[in-house]
Amino acid sequence: MFKHEKQLLNGMQVKVERENPQYAVLMQEQLGGANGELKAAMQYLSQSFRVKDQALKDLFLDIGTEELSHMEIVAETINLLNGHSVNYEVVGVGEVESHVLSGLTPFLVNSSGEPWTANYVSVTGDIVADLLSNIASEQRAKVVYEYLYRQINDKEVRRTIDFLLNREEAHNALFREALNKVKNEGSNKDFGVTEDSKLYFDLSTPGRYVQDPNPTEPSFSNPRR
């Protein structure tokens, strides 16, 4: 069950220094993009349905729910940046849907105007694979927010981005902690138990491949030659 609280997450107040439709276009990436908030929410909530451990299930549900609140924050930021005047020319060659289709309403598209798709969502039913996917998702989302921060010269929007970026770091840390707790479960049960799984083929330099009757675990710092 979900309930909507009128107050934004953590008492957040979304503000902008001034209207800027181009900045709104950039922020659309984190609303309807492949590494955006809607994608994260749908991914974690969908994954939670097959998680048996109640503590981990709660983690997936809690973070997924928080991502929905992030989506609300991003959408409100876009709404303020778009202002009140419908004029596709102000976004140049950027995403024009909000000016010709949605009447400036934040739209479920990315910064190029491509619609959100469930193809962005990764669900395997394997707790280890899903956690690894989520760690990578949070890292990518952080990178996108860093790019946005560098390009958006609005201190209020930057404050919002900084908060969201830091929350991606928190989620990343939580998923990493969860991964440590299930390191011998799921697809990790028989991980690295055969000789083939311990080979590192040194294909980048001249010389023999790894051919050893007693292979050691792969190592990037000291490859067997």
From Swiss-Prot:
Disordered: annotated span: 204-225
Cofactor: Ca(2+); Mn(2+)
Keyword set includes Transcription regulation: no
Binding, Mn(2+) 1: 37, 67, 70
Single GO term (MF): metal ion binding
Keywords: Calcium, Manganese, Metal-binding, Oxidoreductase, Peroxidase
Details of cofactor binding: Binds 1 Ca(2+) ion per subunit. Binds 2 manganese ions per subunit.
InterPro entries in UniProt: Ferritin-like (IPR012347), Ferritin-like_SF (IPR009078), Mn_catalase (IPR007760), Mn_catalase_dom (IPR039377)
EC number: 1.11.1.6
Biased composition (Polar residues): 213-225
Pfam families noted in UniProt: Mn_catalase
Binding positions for Mn(2+) 2 per the UniProt entry: 67, 138, 171
Residues involved in Ca(2+) binding: 58, 62, 204
Catalytic function, reaction form: 2 H2O2 = O2 + 2 H2O
UniProt function note: Catalyzes the decomposition of hydrogen peroxide into water and oxygen.
Protein family membership: Belongs to the manganese catalase family.
The protein's name: Probable manganese catalase
Species of origin: Clostridium acetobutylicum (strain ATCC 824 / DSM 792 / JCM 1419 / IAM 19013 / LMG 5710 / NBRC 13948 / NRRL B-527 / VKM B-1787 / 2291 / W)
Top-level taxonomy: Bacteria, Bacillati, Bacillota, Clostridia, Eubacteriales
